[in-house]
Amino acid sequence: MQREEGFNTKMADGPDEYDTEAGCVPLLHPEEIKPQSHYNHGYGEPLGRKTHIDDYSTWDIVKATQYGIYERCRELVEAGYDVRQPDKENVTLLHWAAINNRIDLVKYYISKGAIVDQLGGDLNSTPLHWATRQGHLSMVVQLMKYGADPSLIDGEGCSCIHLAAQFGHTSIVAYLIAKGQDVDMMDQNGMTPLMWAAYRTHSVDPTRLLLTFNVSVNLGDKYHKNTALHWAVLAGNTTVISLLLEAGANVDAQNIKGESALDLAKQRKNVWMINHLQEARQAKGYDNPSFLRKLKADKEFRQKVMLGTPFLVIWLVGFIADLNIDSWLIKGLMYGGVWATVQFLSKSFFDHSMHSALPLGIYLATKFWMYVTWFFWFWNDLNFLFIHLPFLANSVALFYNFGKSWKSDPGIIKATEEQKKKTIVELAETGSLDLSIFCSTCLIRKPVRSKHCGVCNRCIAKFDHHCPWVGNCVGAGNHRYFMGYLFFLLFMICWMIYGCISYWGLHCETTYTKDGFWTYITQIATCSPWMFWMFLNSVFHFMWVAVLLMCQMYQISCLGITTNERMNARRYKHFKVTTTSIESPFNHGCVRNIIDFFEFRCCGLFRPVIVDWTRQYTIEYDQISGSGYQLV
């Protein structure tokens, strides 16, 4: 190691700093505990750059180890210093090297006989404990290669995985689990890694990672019988509370005092926690009459309600308007009843965890009533050969592309449990276990252009966006079908608008040229309120579909990027972003971009470059052999 490296790292100056923050001691009065940040654990301050060169020849071996002065340390060891000998604070050289991430010194000391699991310091900890608590993944990997045991407990009863969890070192938690540590391991006080993460770490990780490893969310600790949800409430950890509720944490679990998480939230008068915990109870059917409880407990029924409500609402809006009733007061009361019904269904049965169900229901309902209108209102008025036949052919293509967009694999990146653990170990041991390329939810190395979808909760290759209108992500596996869906949907809507205008021309005694715009609008709305309602739906859908189709085609053909990449280009190092443009390494010219995206082939005249984006980890791929297209 170069000597200058020591001046740009953090150094711990004494073992008393190891226990600045409470560790794994029994917590006898959880209601009095304040949440503490893992960033303030007293391990030392960043060292500034030296303005002069010290005479290292006068340094003792502890100071030289802390600063990583390899030559001075070797000089003293060769002169007879015993590397196993603890200093006056009962701390060994291996501890000091581990806490300050001096990998070359660790290798040297172990080669000279240092004991890798020697206990030391006030907390009677191993060097691996010190490295873990400080968050040095590379040091953890190195020590475990030399046989360090992560399951050993320190003086407070914690093993390494508990320290990593409570200090938010997600990469170390992942590595320890991948190396065989039990995800539900309890410390001496009965606290699991999940409990520590819920109590100490106010971010999604490592809690999210632990949940992905199928941790037991409803275990209680040894002393208080608090579950992870109890500890999250005690700490006011709203981020983790949401994760635990999504993972199925038992909101009614009671601790040794008979208190639920909701009881603790009420004691703290935290409105956010109280509301979310009550909503979680209601979602499980508690606090409601028995009949509603049974229905609300049925997730499939709730999904059907969300899908079916738009069918009812769209029909009722048009039906009420079409009623032969002159009194708008009566119609207003009827619309009020529709609104009240929707509010009741929304509060009682809508499951907001099913993000796509309602938009998908709106799309399906709109198209259903449009087709009903087409066949029952337009069929006898329009020419079969020139209108109905093309419309039906377009509908077949629309249904096909919609079905493929909805139900096909968008490019989910899959891996077995063993593959996930192998990936974690490989990335950690090569110094690449970075959350920018590793997904802590799916536990996979993220291919280039991929992204974890928060709605679907899975990583998607060449992720474009999550589309609620098709109830699926749009990615490498279904993006072409999604474009086909937009294209044929736009034509279907155009035909619907044409049908409405033709219907008014045949059945309504008014014309735009004769009566003017406003009179024409009021006349056609009065002539057939249902038709006018369908026309408004068609115009609304035409606007967003047309805009979306144009944006998608521009991104695909002219920019060579996805929607996600365009929105987050500054986050990705491989994009060159200016105030006016985005330069993409995946942009190979308009014609080639289109051929590659749609995989066009034409009798050998051109052929696309096919890339498996589920396995592509770099921006370099063979563009020459595929050559995009060739003119013959």
Curated annotation (Swiss-Prot):
It comes from Homo sapiens. ANK repeats lie at residues 51-86, 89-118, 123-152, 156-185, 189-219, 224-253, 257-286. It is an enzyme of class 2 (transferase). This is Palmitoyltransferase ZDHHC17. Its EC number is 2.3.1.225, 2.3.1.-. Interacts (via ANK repeats) with numerous proteins (via the consensus sequence motif [VIAP]-[VIT]-x-x-Q-P). Interacts (via ANK repeats) with CLIP3. Interacts (via ANK repeats) with HTT; this interaction is inversely correlated to the length of the polyglutamine tract added to the huntingtin protein in Huntington disease. Interacts (via ANK repeats) with DNAJC5 (via C-terminus). Interacts (via ANK repeats) with MAP6. Interacts (via ANK repeats) with SNAP23. Interacts (via ANK repeats) with SNAP25. Interacts (via ANK repeats) with EVL. Interacts with SPRED1 and SPRED3. The chain crosses the membrane at residues 305-325, 326-346, 358-378, 382-402, 481-501, 530-550. The keyword Transmembrane applies. GO terms for cellular component: cell projection; glutamatergic synapse; Golgi apparatus; Golgi membrane; Golgi-associated vesicle membrane; intracellular membrane-bounded organelle; perforant pathway to dendrate granule cell synapse; postsynaptic Golgi apparatus. It is found in: Golgi apparatus membrane; Cytoplasmic vesicle membrane; Presynaptic cell membrane. The active site is at C467. GO terms for molecular function: identical protein binding; palmitoyltransferase activity; protein-cysteine S-myristoyltransferase activity; protein-cysteine S-palmitoyltransferase activity; protein-cysteine S-stearoyltransferase activity; signaling receptor binding.
